[in-house]
Amino acid sequence: MIDVDALSKKYPAIKQMQAYEPIFWKNLNYKKEAELPVGVEHIFDAEARFQRFAPYFEVAFPETLPTHGILESPLLKMDKMKAVLNAEAQNQVKGDLYLKADNYLPISGSIKSRGGIYEVLKFAEKVAMKHGEIVYGDNYAKLNEPRFKDLFGQYGIVVGSTGNLGLSIGIVACKLGFRTSVHMSSDAAQWKKDMLREKGVNVVEYNDNFTHAITEARKSAEADPMAYFIDDEGSYDLFLGYSVAAVRLQAQLKAQNIKVDAEHPLFVYLPAGVGGSPSGVAFGLKKIIGENVHPIFAEPTHIPSVSLGMMTGLNDQISVYDAGIDGVTKADGLAVGRPSRIAGKMMDTLLYGIQTFDDQKMMKNVAELHDSENVDVEPSAASGFTILDDVQAQLEQDYPMENASHIVWATGGSMVPKNDMDQYVAEGHQVK
């Protein structure tokens, strides 16, 4: 049992967390030296694998033709949204504000297209090579042929998800021919479950939280010798799939003449649930773009799992439920009570800090983004905007802000059905 009273004496911010007050946790280990189990070479290995699969995506998912089979999203300037936010803020955003629009990523419309799809590709390549069906120099478009569907159909892919990870893995694994099961927690949006079933995925629903769903998913995979389990709580393949985003972002920064140096720092605001995708992206940013990019996570006040884990140093050994925090949030993609086994360890020296936020403010930002920039995102994807005001006060103590650039990472949204999106916007309009 975890002695929460003793912990909260040592870390007084836990009391604020228990009262659902927004907090900023500053990482005192930021920028210290650390030995990490993966490095820049692993990022480029993952990028090369995405390149090998590009011809497959062009034939299997024609929506990727405009980007030649590469799954990437635009970097959009947010001048109107910045003006809206600054009109309400106590702490003005100085410099330029951008949206990394992973809500527009092809195939599954979320950041999970990066890590989730990558791990499926890596497994598919391994299986095809094991059976002598492909070599590295082949044109991978042939993986769309019926004989590969028959081969992959002998294998299962299993994952536990609150929604977007299941969507990305389910769509691609099923298309390749794998028997695919997605175990979903009670937080998962109905439309995500419906879409997966339409694609032929076996959706297993639980009237319980993510930790329960992923535990059951793991058990079911262990019981099937031909099943491969994708572990959102501890997979380095997922992590590295996300990290490739940094290679692509670096090129976008150059194309848009966005300077990144000591006088022009770059701040990147990433929503965190289990912490895998923002950690993978943050790792990539620090390894590829370097010391003048500063990642910051955003978490709901009702489920601050990564901040609780990192603040106490307990990481995945503590869940928000241990601290009596209810874990209820409208940000379904962030509804994970226990952080990933690798997020806290990998982020120990690479993450500037974490800001928690109020759900109502997030819903307001969903509506403001819709109204000002005509960009639709699901609630959790707006949370980078939600934390801007609070975080600026912290950043100004450490960095020159006049010429800074800020990137809010929009983690999902383009697949949201219109009725659901209209409801999110209407709810946001109600918030004063």
Swiss-Prot record:
Task: Answer yes or no on keyword Lyase.
Answer: yes
Q: Which InterPro entries match?
A: D_Ser_am_lyase, Ser/Thr_Dehydratase, Ser/Thr_deHydtase_PyrdxlP-BS, TrpB-like_PALP, TrpB-like_PALP_sf
What are the N6-(pyridoxal phosphate)lysine sites (modified residues) in this protein? 112
- SUPFAM superfamilies this protein is in? Tryptophan synthase beta subunit-like PLP-dependent enzymes
Cofactor(s) listed: pyridoxal 5'-phosphate
Record family assignment: Belongs to the serine/threonine dehydratase family. DsdA subfamily.
Tell me which HAMAP family the record gives. Answer: D_Ser_dehydrat
Q: What is this protein called?
A: Probable D-serine dehydratase
